């Protein structure tokens, strides 16, 4: 028998499936929201419904946005000669928190993985190659995780871009082997961007 009723137990179970939350944390959050349901819960429900309806991928870079083109791609003050390639949106957000990069981004939507059957055709690599030609890009910074999949993806992209003549660089010191960008602190990300190297 559910101690709090089926609807509340279902909400707790659903929240417990979110990344970084377990059953105990989910239960505490749900109790907190119920106690403040006229303020925080109603506001959160409205915001979540709005995001569910309007969130989409930027047509240019793949960032998550509420319109067709994200604010980064629309920003005329961004450097236009550089594209920083990341695995997913969480990595883009991590780099933005560090404020070390002032160019534009390209989100791949994953990494090459034979185990997970993710090939080049499953990623946004063709769009990257098209952007290089269309936007006059001079440097592609591969800010990919230092995992086997991340480095395999980096090498594949470097080889695919070789005929274009664009400079291809990658993050250097500061990123631990096997590390994920989303878990790094801002200083480490900044140092890694400044010490990038040619691949």
UniProtKB/Swiss-Prot annotation:
Matching HAMAP family: RecR
UniProtKB keywords: DNA damage, DNA recombination, DNA repair, Metal-binding, Zinc, Zinc-finger
Zinc finger (C4-type): 58-73
Cited Pfam families: RecR_C, RecR_HhH, RecR_ZnF, Toprim_4
Role summary: May play a role in DNA repair. It seems to be involved in an RecBC-independent recombinational process of DNA repair. It may act with RecF and RecO.
InterPro entries: DNA_Rcmb_RecR, Rcmb_RecR, Rcmb_RecR_Znf, TOPRIM_dom, TOPRIM_RecR
Domain Toprim: start-end pairs: 81-176
GO molecular function, one term: DNA binding
Species, as recorded: Paracoccus denitrificans (strain Pd 1222)
Protein name per Swiss-Prot or TrEMBL: Recombination protein RecR
Domain of life, source organism: Bacteria
NCBIfam families named among the record's database cross-references: recR
GO biological process: DNA recombination; DNA repair
SUPFAM superfamilies in the record: Recombination protein RecR
Family: Belongs to the RecR family.
Keyword ATP-binding in record: no
